[in-house]
Amino acid sequence: MDRDLEQALDRTENITEIAQQRRPRRRYSPRAGKTLQEKLYDIYVEECGKEPEDPQELRSNVNLLEKLVRRESLPCLLVNLYPGNQGYSVMLQREDGSFAETIRLPYEERALLDYLDAEELPPALGDVLDKASVNIFHSGCVIVEVRDYRQSSNMQPPGYQSRHILLRPTMQTLAPEVKTMTRDGEKWSQEDKFPLESQLILATAEPLCLDPSVAVACTANRLLYNKQKMNTDPMEQCLQRYSWPSVKPQQEQSDCPPPPELRVSTSGQKEERKVGQPCELNITKAGSCVDTWKGRPCDLAVPSEVDVEKLAKGYQSVTAADPQLPVWPAQEVEDPFRHAWEAGCQAWDTKPNIMQSFNDPLLCGKIRPRKKARQKSQKSPWQPFPDDHSACLRPGSETDAGRAVSQAQESVQSKVKGPGKMSHSSSGPASVSQLSSWKTPEQPDPVWVQSSVSGKGEKHPPPRTQLPSSSGKISSGNSFPPQQAGSPLKRPFPAAAPAVAAAAPAPAPAPAAAPALAAAAVAAAAGGAAPSHSQKPSVPLIKASRRRPAAGRPTRFVKIAPAIQVRTGSTGLKATNVEGPVRGAQVLGCSFKPVQAPGSGAPAPAGISGSGLQSSGGPLPDARPGAVQASSPAPLQFFLNTPEGLRPLTLQVPQGWAVLTGPQQQSHQLVSLQQLQQPTAAHPPQPGPQGSTLGLSTQGQAFPAQQLLNVNLTGAGSGLQPQPQAAVLSLLGSAQVPQQGVQLPFVLGQQPQPLLLLQPQPQPQQIQLQTQPLRVLQQPVFLATGAVQIVQPHPGVQAGSQLVGQRKGGKPTPPAP
């Protein structure tokens, strides 16, 4: 296809060259008259046979229409193009040869001009041409003479440039011609009009070439291109820039006066006049300067030395003593360490302004209280005094900023009110060196207690401890080492040794050790008194260490591992090792005062083990009577006696029971443990988390003024060695709390859960609790390995399995049947 097209284009060029070189042949028409096309062809043949008169005139066969009009004086339509905004007009020729103006249009109306460029007869002029007195149609075509006055408007008289255009009819003009011809009195049917229209089309159409060749179409396109090469879109855009529709808006804008705000001021006009004046500068040569005043030549010599100090003017540099110093914006560093504890305290926001003096590297910081909690106070920028040079400060470096932040923290820590620091002390036969039996390759780091700061920091709600359920895993905090869960002990209850040393495993104790625990609890309740501030308390103070609080986690979890084992008969304070998670847990490290349990011949060491203990600063939650579902545990709150006052301790327990005695029942019945595991061969320690899960569900009873809660934690699992874990706490409170029981499930590894049930005689009654100091007592603990079945004792059980005590001391009394 492309090859055929290329051949057709080559043939077109050859035909054009041959037609221009050879002489055309003359044609003879059989008709008497000749058409307009035939007349033009005859002139073309005639011009091609002539020799050029002027050597520069290479072609004479052009402008055939002008030659035809001059030769035959044919009537034509006249179009005048006037200069400027006068527009253009259309004029018809009269019979006497004069022209009458018919239509005058502005240049903005380009419809008629577009038809002239396309060499087509405009349909709008059909009626005007039909009414003309002179017939200007020639074989259905109209000859238009265009007179352009725009190029020679300055001449007198104004001249013009003339050219002729042949307008050919179109289908839009032939249809009105058919109607015009059939207007006479005769009636023309539609069948008669069709032959008339066909004859008009054939008469006005140009000759057709029916040669089936692509070269014919290519030749026609090339001829049309040569005729319309100046009518392309880019050329029209360039010509329209200088046409009147485009120039007119520019002239109108230049003729209009500028707005008042854009007028040049008078001073500016004077400057323009000065600039416009010519300035004559006569630069003479050096040495030819003449002093016009004295009339003698002036020799200008360059001085060898110039006293600069006399001629120059110096400016003093800005120093630190200059009072006019720039005001530096105060740079604020927000202290991320915020302290808050109890409800009702005012929140403070520490924002030290880090500024450094010019004279010395002293730093100053500011601590401003906030107006509202959890909102930053707006501070006015620091302004130096003009007369006070010591107040001239500048922004410090990052090192100074860090130093200022540390100073601000120290100032806050020194001014806040919190518990004092007190280290754990130990006396008696117990020694801290005995912790070696509990050491593991990966010991958890001891966690210091973060003390509450009254009046500083953010306000947090009282945290509550949720102990994990019996799933064998601890939800938060570091798990105890495997060797703690199954530490090899020589025997569970040493009789005379001050501490338990690492040795081979021993058989489990007998069930008769349970009464020792009950009796020891009664004796501790009767004989133990609240410690005073002047004496060394049985509960040591918390060692406070301020740490950065965790964002968004007000609840902190703690684990307390038993560190040493002591005999019942020993005296003095005992130390405990406190272990907990990394994130600022609050741990209660207590030393216990041993009490000899009546009725038991063997002492029992004790320790504290918990996986979810936490001190809380909130009030005791109110509880309403009624059954509560086991899935929604209720909190159990204790109070710890410290030099600063009572500290709340909240225990959140999942599911279970622990029955506390009513107000009139003074004794607890401790269920004896049955089906104890027999001593087995020593096995290597099995890994497993060590801890306890406390649970509480309330059902309409209130705690008495003072009760004893004996917690006996037993481990389960084959091959696991017994460990002493017990805590005897004195329940204190100041609100009515329903009481039903506390279940203490304990899990070691993935073995079944042994449960210990403390059940009193059911005497429900509600009384008001009175706030009293907390006593933490160490009692003999019975530990057994293996599955434990919980059985409610019969009233006829031996008296050694019953726990009897009084709230305010006294001798133990047997429980009611």
From Swiss-Prot:
Signal peptide feature range: none
Pfam families: Spt20_SEP
Entry GO MF terms: transcription coregulator activity
An individual GO BP term: regulation of transcription by RNA polymerase II
InterPro entries according to UniProt: Spt20, Spt20-like_SEP
Listed Polar residues bias regions: 423-440
Compositional bias per record (Low complexity), positions renumbered to this chain: 469-479, 494-505, 513-531, 598-618
Family designation: Belongs to the SPT20 family.
Protein name listed in UniProt: Transcription factor SPT20 homolog-like 2
